[in-house]
Amino acid sequence: WSMPIYPTAGHDRDSLANALFYHYQIHGVKLGFHPVYRLDKDTSGLIVIAKHGYAAAVLSKSIEKEYTAVCEGVLKGEGTIDVPIRLKEGYTIQREVAKDGQRAVTHWKVAGGTNHHTLLQIRLETGRTHQIRVHFSHIGHPLAGDDMYGGHLNGIGCSKVLFVHPVTGHRIELTCPPQDDMMALVQ
């Protein structure tokens, strides 16, 4: 099930912002809607929303995210992809690996797989648009489900978020299991 973060054409009533403001309304709460980070359109999983802009700004500088993804083909062990990414010339959304792009670093570790797909745990050192998708396509293992960069089916989700609560100072760890359709690819 896909839910956009903000209302868009075709999704003017079923966004996360709509749902949260409805929740605020029925509970008589007046708070803001401040996503701490964004997820690409077809990425499932955890999203952290701050109640205040200041909290979002503080959290955005210190939040740690881990992704679970399924790529096509077989990878072994762990590794780092450290190649720059830029907007692909002539496109408004699509990115590509290019020497004159922005630095982009992706750390990955194999967590399972089959003869056709590999389950990965991924941590980003940088946060470029489509970074995971572009990097794995670049090394010849596009994400399952990524029709823009060469994959098939749905293959990425934000599975873990760690942060220090901006008011209490407590360390918070949130986890979310991968979607069933993604896990079916590696079982």
Regions found by a protein language model. Give the residues of each.
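Pseudouridine synthases involved in rRNA/tRNA modification
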Residues: 112-117, 125, 133-187
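Intrinsic-disorder/low-complexity, polar/charged segments enriched in Ser/Thr/Lys/Arg/Asp/Glu/Gln
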Residues: 66, 80, 103-105, 117-119
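A structural micro-motif recognizing beta-strand termini
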Residues: 72, 121-125
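Conserved hydrophobic positions within beta-strands
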Residues: 71, 107-110, 143
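Short coil-to-beta-strand transition motifs
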Residues: 63, 76, 98-106, 155-156
